[in-house]
Design a protein with these regions (language model features):
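A conserved ligand/cofactor-binding region detector
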Residues: 1-755
Length: 755
């Protein structure tokens, strides 16, 4: 029973408190509740090291997990206050970017909920990625000073400090902790490292800053612009600072728990989340040898402790750094890396598997694979592609290391918190058990034939659509029709995710309406995406979307039937509002390029129907829901891989033979678009599509248009559509991050649960 009361933390009547005072009181209450619950502990602990933890707002999530949300809500209501005011007041931590960061956040939630001793380990960025705005129909960036808005109060400064040597530069870290609440269980920690010397006043125009002053800039931004050498070096500094702190923390804690370091694998499991934390491997070797362990034994210890998760099929995202970078930043590690590479060369003659290639580049993924005991992909298709093509040479060496762990999401945030209306309906039908055992959602399958239940699902979706419509108008002034189909693509802007394909469909529909077509129901196309500041074509795609939206939304002949909305500064909080309101989930990456995706799972759980390629986790979604409850299109991954292998794809050939496609592409540089947008940027995008189209937008265009037409037609059968929604919700249980984490633990970490 909860004995903590909000009024005990204010010193005066709640009715007399400001929002800030109430927020700080709620924060203090949750921190005390966490301490009362206790923290998961045990002999062996997993350290989940990641450059990103996109945790989202914490207040409501923590109150729900601690079982006191309703109590606090009621106490506020008695004082004439609304808990939603506190939720809106809260500022979102800027500690991540896209799917990688959201996955990390879901995983630490599940680790805590399942009672597994675990810490997330990363960096305490001051300004995160950036805050996005739109001016002149272009993306503009500015610092996201999230730590100045009270959110830093969640982040408790500790008295732990570590020295990190980077060449002649000695850095002294400070560790911060954020409580990670488990749902009905004990808590965990997110450990974040920072430098006290970092100075936000170093930031000039936009997000520009002096990249050479490492002591002042190290943790200013996540993923600093690496289009020049200083930016690349800064990334190496960041990565080493993160893992050196992590390695020192891990060894200290394991010794405290009784390890003699020879038996480190009995006390620690390290999950390397993508290649950013890869330097933890040679850093651990260095620290172990400094403590008297022979280097050869240190290699084996580190291999037994470390496991690597690969998150990408894109070669560009598999980090490779020139050797001279390491000589500049971590000269003390370079001899270790060279000896590790010599050990690989002595064992395997194949030059393609060496850590240091013939050009002197250090391949981080290669180091991870050789010196980890487990290598996993994040969806079955992704893992198969790694084994069969992208990492086939490594798979032949270490078939026993490779395994699949299909990603998952935390249902606590992605339905219980963000969609209480649907949560209430599910619980009414099948009870509370699904909240901790998501497989129980399967019990909803019989209700897919129950018209009363289906009408309830439609009603709740309609409620969320109206709420989002009202919020959007208040937030950025866009008016949308809640009776329209909400067609949603919200994810990081990248050519392989193919926002440009969705844009071409919208242009095609616009041209069709201008020719006299009158759709039965309007469609609102939502985009939400940030483009990396140095990613020119991604920024051009955003510009084209904004220019086109200004045309279509202001055309009285078209806007009653089609609207295009580009959401400003898309983040977790916005996703929590839009995903429950969405009808169609756009998951249209080029087959073979998306490792998994997790947005697809969040949409599915909230009753949106997927329109997607057979890529990433879409393949597993399709198998679970059946072909009647998903809309798939496009080339297969095998066909795409074959095109790349043969280098036989020519964009212009597709453009010439498809008049509908050509008309949509040509519209990018039409008089209307050039008047609305920037000629240079639109021409760049046009030329890129016609001259290269590296992610094969054109071959999938016809199939995409036909399939979306099919989806929009199916939407008109409201009971038929509701059945698709019900099946998707019922089958979403497999994609719980609790299931994923259980698999990691059973197959890789072998921790004992503290529950």
């Amino acid at each position: 029973m909860n004995t903590l009361k909000l009024r005990d933390y204010t010193g005066k009547a709640l009715s007399e408190c400001t929002i800030l005072e109430l927020y700080n009181a709620a924060l203090a209450l949750t921190q005390d509740a966490c301490r009362n619950r206790g923290y998961n502990s045990g002999k062996k602990k997993v350290y989940y090291i990641s450059a990103e933890f996109l945790i989202g707002k914490l207040l409501s999530n923590n109150l729900i997990n601690l079982g006191i949300y309703d109590d606090v809500k009621a106490e506020l209501a008695e004082a004439g206050k609304d808990i939603t005011e506190l939720e809106e007041f809260e500022y979102e931590p800027s500690l991540g970017n896209g799917g990688l960061g959201r996955l990390s956040a879901c995983f630490i939630d599940s680790l805590a909920t399942l009672g597994l001793p675990a810490d997330g380990v990363g960096l305490a960025y001051h300004c995160g990625l950036f805050k996005q705005s739109f001016e002149d129909r272009k993306q503009h960036t500015r610092p996201d000073y999230w730590r100045k808005w009270g959110m830093a109060n969640w982040m408790k400064r500790t008295d732990k400090h570590y020295k990190v040597q980077c060449g002649d530069l000695e850095l002294l870290s400070t560790m911060y902790e954020i409580d990670v609440t488990g749902y009905g269980s004990k808590c965990g920690h997110l450990r974040l490292f920072d430098l006290d010397t970092v100075n936000e006043r170093l930031i000039g125009s936009g997000i520009d800053f002096d990249k050479k002053e490492i002591e002042k800039n190290l943790t200013l931004f996540m993923y600093p612009d690496d289009s020049d050498e200083d930016g690349k070096l800064l990334r190496v500094y960041q990565e080493y600072f993160m893992v050196s702190n992590a390695a020192q923390l891990i060894l200290d804690e394991c010794v405290e728990r009784g390890s003699n370091l020879h038996d480190l694998a009995d006390y620690a499991a390290i999950q390397i989340n993508d290649t950013h934390p890869s330097l933890v491997i040679p850093e651990l070797v260095r620290l172990l040898t400094e403590k008297g362990i022979e280097e050869k034994e240190a290699y084996q210890i580190v291999t037994d402790v470390c496991a690597y998760t690969n998150h990408t099929i894109l070669a560009e995202a598999l980090e490779t750094w020139p050797k001279h970078f390491f000589k500049a930043v971590v000269p003390h590690l370079m001899p270790i890396i060279k000896r590790m590479n010599d050990a690989v060369k002595a064992k395997y003659e194949d030059p393609s598997v060496q850590i240091i290639d013939e050009y002197g580049n250090v391949h981080m993924a290669h180091m991870d694979i050789h010196y980890s005991h487990s290598v996993n992909g994040v969806a079955r298709l992704h893992t198969d592609i790694l084994k069969e093509t992208e990492l086939n040479n490594f798979y032949k060496l270490y078939p026993e290391k490779f395994n699949n762990k299909t990603n998952g999401i935390t249902f606590r945030r992605w339905v219980i918190e963000c969609n209480p209306e649907l949560t209430e309906l599910i619980t009414e039908k099948i009870g509370e058990g699904w909240k901790t055992d998501a497989r129980q959602l399967e019990q909803l399958i019989p209700y897919a034939e129950d018209e009363a239940f289906l009408q309830c699902i439609l009603n709740r979706k309609n409620t969320k659509k109206h709420k989002f419509s009202a919020w959007l108008e208040k937030y950025q002034g866009d008016k949308v029709d809640p009776e329209s189909v909400y067609d949603v693509q919200i994810k990081r802007l990248h050519e392989y995710k193919r926002q440009q394909l969705n844009l071409l469909w919208a242009i095609d529909r616009y041209l069709h309406i201008k020719d006299g077509y009158r759709p039965r129901r309007p469609v609102t196309v939502f985009f939400g995406a940030k483009a990396a500041p140095a990613y020119v074509i991604a920024k051009d795609i955003i510009h084209a979307i904004l220019a086109f939206s200004s045309i279509v939304n202001n055309d009285p002949e078209v806007s009653p039937y089609l609207k295009v909305v580009m959401l400003r500064n898309y983040n977790v909080s916005m996703a929590e509002k839009l995903i429950p309101a969405s009808d169609i989930s756009e998951q249209i990456s080029l087959a073979s390029k998306e490792a998994s995706g997790t947005g697809n799972m969040k949409f599915m759980l909230n009753g949106a129907v997927t329109l997607g390629t057979m890529d990433g986790a879409n393949v597993e979604i399709a198998e679970l829901v059946g072909e009647d409850n998903i809309f798939t299109f496009g080339q297969s991954s095998e066909e795409v891989i074959e095109h790349y292998k043969n280098a036989d794809y020519v964009a212009k050939n597709w453009y010439k033979k498809d008049k509908r496609l050509a008309a949509a592409v040509d519209f990018l540089v039409s008089e209307e678009m050039l008047e609305a947008g920037d000629r240079k940027l639109l021409k760049q995008l046009y030329d890129e599509l016609l001259g290269r189209d590296w992610f094969m937008t054109f071959p999938d265009f016809e199939s995409y248009c036909k399939t979306k037409d099919k989806a929009l037609a199916a939407y008109e059968d409201r009971m038929g559509w509701a059945k698709k929604m019900a099946v998707n919700i019922a089958k979403a249980g497999y994609f719980s991050s609790d299931r994923t984490i259980d698999q990691y633990n059973n197959d890789i970490w072998h921790l004992e649960k503290d529950c």
